[in-house]
Amino acid sequence: MLLEQQKQLISLIQAAVAQCLPEAQAQVQLERPKVAAHGDIATNVAMQLAKPARRNPRELAQGIVDALMAQPQARELIQDAEIAGPGFINFRLTPAARQAVVQAVASQADAYGRAPRNGEKVLVEFVSANPTGPLHVGHARQAALGDAICRLYDASGWDVTREFYYNDAGNQIDNLAISVQARGRGIAPDAPDYPADGYKGDYIVEIARDFAARKSVQASDGQPVTATGDLDSLDDIRAFAVAYLRREQDLDLQAFGLAFDNYFLESSLYASGRVQETVDTLVAKGHTYEEGGALWLRTTELGTGDDKDRVMRKSEGGYTYFVPDVAYHKVKWERGFHHAVNIQGSDHHGTVARVRAGLQGLEAGIPKDFPAYVLHKMVKVMRGGEEVKISKRAGSYVTMRDLIDWVGRDAVRYFLIQRRADTEFVFDIDLALSKSDENPVYYIQYAHARICTMIGNSGASAAEIAQADTALLTAPSEYALLQRLAEFPQVVALAAQELAPHHVAFWLRDCASDFHAWYNAERVLVDEPALKLARLRLAATTRQVLANGLALLGVSAPDRM
C-alpha cells in the first residue's frame, strides 16, 4: 500500500472512530498481516479504544467498519473489511488501489522511494583508518554501511558530506616509521632486533623499496611526497610512509566505488592548537582535576553515562586518544554540522560516552547525543569451510582488496550490509561466488537481468508497455508483487530513520522472491496482447524499483548475467 494511501486510510479510520466514539483520540496504526490470506493491511485501533470506552472490541470494530465503508473515499480504497480475532480489522484493497503503484513508479522513475530536499545537512564519518596498512575487512564493512547510510540520507532529502578522519598522529605512526626503517636496513620481521611492535606485512617491504628509490606518492587530497632515501631520518620515512599508505587506501576505496568529500587529519588538530584549546577550555570550566601526575576529566559528572572519570593527559605528558576526538567533534559542530554520524567498530564503544562528555564539558550548546553512532561487529571470512585469517601482503589480516578481488565489489557491498550492524557476520566466499538462489546478490541481480531480457524479447515498444491496462493484473502472485513494490518508500524511510540499510537488503531479497514466484506462476509473454502488455508493465515496474533499491546499497543492476 502506497504511503499516500496509508495516510488517506488513517484519516478515514479516524473519521469513522469519531462517529463511534466522539471523545476518543485515535492513534491509528496500520500493519501488513503476516498471512496474506488475512488481507492487505490491518489495524488494531478497536482493541486500543475498547477498554477505556468500556466497549466490546469486536462490536466496536464492526461499528468502525460500518462508519468507514459509508464514506465514498473509503470505498475507492477498500474492497472489503472483516473483523478477526479479538478485534483486529483486516482490509482488502480494491484492484485499482493495489495497482496504483505502477503509475506511481512510472511517474517518479529513479525518484521513487526518495523524499524532497529538506534543507538539512549531515556529516557521516566512516572508515577513518590509521594510515599504517591496507584496509581490512572491518573497514570494508564500515565502507559498505557508511556509503549506504549516506545514500539513504540523500534519498531522505539531506545534503550529505562523507568524511574520512585520518589518525595520522601517535605511537602507531611511529611504529610504522621504524618498521620501514628496519626493513630498509635489511632486518627481517623474525630477527631479534626488529621492532617489537613493528608491522610485518609485505607492504612494509614495498614502502622501504620505494623510499630507497626516492619515488613520489600523492594521496587524493594531498601534495606529492618525494622520498629522500635517508634511512636515518625517521621524519622523512614517516612522511613518505603515511602518504604511501594513504594512496594505497585511496586505491582500495576506488576499487570499492567509494569517494569521500573530505579528508580530515588528526595531526591538523595539534598543528592548529585545537587539542590544547580543548584541554584549556575543559580546565577553565572546572571539569578536570589532577591526580597521580595525570589530568582527569570528570566524565561521570557530565551526564553522558560514563561509569568513571577518564585520563586526558598522562603522567608523562601525552594526551589519551579521546582528547583529539573531542576537539575534532567540536570542529564538526563549528562547521555547521549539527547532525553527525560516526560509523565505527564495536571495540570503540567505550569512546562514545567519553567524547560526548568532553563535548558537554566545553559548554558550547552541543546536545548530549551528539554525535550519533553506528557500531558494527567484526567480520569472519570463510572459504572452503575454513576461516581465512591472513593476507600475505597485510601480514595478519584479510584485506578489503582481497574481498573485492575474490568476489567483486557488488557482492562485498551487499553481503556486508545484509545483516544488522551490531551482529557478527560470517562472509562466505563460496556462497558469494555461487550462481544459485542461496546467493542473495545473484538472486536479486538475476531478477533484474531476467526482466531486461524478457522485455527485450517481447517485441513490445516502451510506449506500448507504458500504456498497458493494469486492471488486468488480478492474479494472487501479481497482487503480492504489487504490494511489495508499494512498500518500498516506507522501507527506505525506516532504513534512513534507524541508520539500518539492512532493511533495504531484506526488501530486495523479498521483492526478487515475489518476482520469481510470479514469473513461475504466470506466463508473461502470453498470446492475449492486452494481458501480455499488462504483465510486461508490471515487470518493467519491478525492474525500476529493484534498480532503485540496489542503487541505495551501491550495487549495480545488470541488464544481463
From Swiss-Prot:
Predominant localisation class: cytoplasm
Annotated Pfam families: Arg_tRNA_synt_N, DALR_1, tRNA-synt_1d
GO biological process, one term: arginyl-tRNA aminoacylation
CDD domains: Anticodon_Ia_Arg (cd07956), ArgRS_core (cd00671)
A single Gene Ontology CC term: cytoplasm
Annotated keywords: Aminoacyl-tRNA synthetase, ATP-binding, Cytoplasm, Ligase, Nucleotide-binding, Protein biosynthesis
Protein name, per record: Arginine--tRNA ligase
